[in-house]
Regions:
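Short helix-initiation/N-cap motifs at beta->coil->alpha
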Residues: 33, 90-104
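Extracytoplasmic/periplasmic substrate-recognition and gating elements
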Residues: 123-183, 213, 233, 237
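Paired acidic/hydrophobic, glycine-rich loop segments that form the ligand-binding mouth/hinge
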Residues: 108-113
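Extracytoplasmic/periplasmic solute-binding protein
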Residues: 3-11, 16, 33-77, 107
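Short, well-ordered alpha-helical scaffold segment located
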Residues: 23-25, 116, 171-172
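A structural signal for short loop-to-beta-strand junctions that line the ligand-binding cleft
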Residues: 1-22, 47-49, 132-140, 211-217
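Conserved C-terminal helix/tail region of periplasmic/extracytoplasmic solute-binding proteins
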Residues: 207-254
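Glycine-centered hinge/linker elements that transmit conformational signals in sensory
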Residues: 70-96
Length: 254
């Protein structure tokens, strides 16, 4: 129950992973330092989101938080690192779509939502068979959940509750994971052969998801999210310093 106004139940989860082109590189380094060094010494830019639209900014924000937590460095240092790769490999004004760059091979790695697996390795994908997946080299893995909700004032609560129960049943969870690449919310399905065959990334992030209840919850309300987005846009447009932008992150993430 949320504020006694509606009821919500998770139906699937996802997390960020690194997809890589097996025809370009053999494996992904096990640390962020290794990934960064590989990018610095090759023609491949850091596998991160590069645009400045609202959706891009939100992806970039989560990437920055994840990299910062994994490497144990400050927000200011993370922002400088992120910006270095954007400026070295991309033109922000005319940036290449990250997924498109990955598909054509100008990027060897792509840091993205695990549910992208279905899109990248589907029957209509030009790169099917050349896509592998690796877990992020993070100490702290972010796990996101997707939920269905019903209004507490609904006149069809019983039917809605039955539907939520159906969506959380084992067979529906298996089909949902197979068809969408979402991670099931039922832990015993992490070893399900059908799910692993359709989504091999589930095995690689199994431990992260199983331990997710012990992780701190990162919650950013709408007002703070807007402030973070505005701060990042100013930083990437060279209108603000990494120190000041990092301070905004620190203040709003407390």
């Amino acid at each position: 129950s949320v504020n006694d106004s509606f009821y919500a139940m998770p139906v699937g989860m996802d997390t960020d992973v690194i997809f890589y082109r097996s025809d370009k590189i053999h494996n992904v380094p096990e640390t962020w330092d290794g990934i960064i060094n590989l990018c610095r010494n090759s023609d491949f830019g850091l596998p991160i989101k590069l645009g400045l639209t609202t959706s891009d900014i939100q992806d970039m924000m989560y990437n920055i938080i994840e990299i910062k937590e994994a490497m144990g460095i400050s927000y200011a240092e993370t922002l400088n690192l992120y910006k270095e790769f954007i400026e070295e490999y991309k033109d922000i004004e005319n940036y290449t779509d990250t997924i498109a760059a990955f598909k054509i091979g100008s990027a060897a790695m792509l840091m993205g939502n695990s549910s992208l697996w279905k899109k990248l390795n589907g029957d209509t994908s030009a790169v099917k068979g050349n896509i592998m997946v690796a877990s992020l080299p993070n100490k702290n893995q972010f796990v996101r959940s997707y939920a269905l909700a019903i209004n507490s004032n609904s006149k069809n609560q019983e039917a809605a509750i039955r539907f939520l129960d159906f969506m959380n049943g084992k067979e529906q969870q298996r089909r949902l994971s197979r068809d969408t690449s979402l991670i099931p919310i039922i832990r015993e399905l992490y070893d399900d052969e059908m799910i692993l065959d359709a989504n091999p990334h589930v095995k690689g992030i199994k431990q992260s998801v199983q331990n997710s209840s012990s992780f701190a919850t990162v919650s950013i309300n709408g007002e703070n999210l807007k402030k973070l987005e505005e701060a990042l846009i100013k930083f990437f447009n060279n209108e603000e310093t990494s120190m000041n932008t990092g301070k905004i992150f620190e203040d709003l993430m407390q």
